[in-house]
Amino acid sequence: MEPVDPRLEPWNHPGSQPKTACNNCYCKRCCYHCLYCFTKKGLGISYGRKKRSQRRRTPQSSKSHQDLIPEQPLSQQQGDQTGQKKQKEALESKTEADPCD
C-alpha cells in the first residue's frame, strides 16, 4: 500500500475515482460502477429536484360536482326568527307565573 499525500482530499485519493465516466445504463455492471451509481441506479435514491406532478383536469364538457347542488333559500339558512321570539316570550311568561322563589 502506497502512502497517500495528506494534503489531498479523500475524494481525490488515487483509486477513489473510477477510470470510466458514469452513464445512463442500468445494467448490473453499471449499477455497481461507483458509489454514486449504486445509490442512484441500484437503490433508486436521487436528491435532485422533483418535478411536480400535474393534477388531472376535468374536461371542459363535464360539469363540476358543485353545479349539481341546488341553492337553498335564504330563510332556511338563517333560521326562523319569529319562532325564536315566540319561544322566548313563552319562557318569560312561564318564569313569571311560577312562584318557586
UniProtKB/Swiss-Prot annotation:
Chain residue ranges for the region called Interaction with the host capping enzyme RNGTT: 49-86
Q: Site: Essential for Tat translocation through the endosomal membrane. Where? A: W11
Q: Which InterPro entries match?
A: IV_Tat, Tat_dom_sf
Tell me the segments the record calls region Interaction with human CREBBP. Answer: 1-24
The short motif Nuclear localization signal, RNA-binding (TAR), and protein transduction is annotated over: 49-57
Region annotation Transactivation: where it falls in the sequence? 1-48
Q: Where is the composition biased (Basic residues)?
A: 48-58
Whether Metal-binding counts among this entry's keywords is yes
Listed binding positions for Zn(2+) 1 are C22, H33, C34, C37
Tell me the leader sequence span: none
Q: Domain text from the record?
A: The cell attachment site mediates the interaction with ITGAV/ITGB3 and ITGA5/ITGB1 integrins, leading to vascular cell migration and invasion. This interaction also provides endothelial cells with the adhesion signal they require to grow in response to mitogens.
Sequence similarity = Belongs to the lentiviruses Tat family.
Q: What is this protein called in UniProt? A: Protein Tat
Lineage, top ranks: Viruses, Riboviria, Pararnavirae, Artverviricota, Revtraviricetes
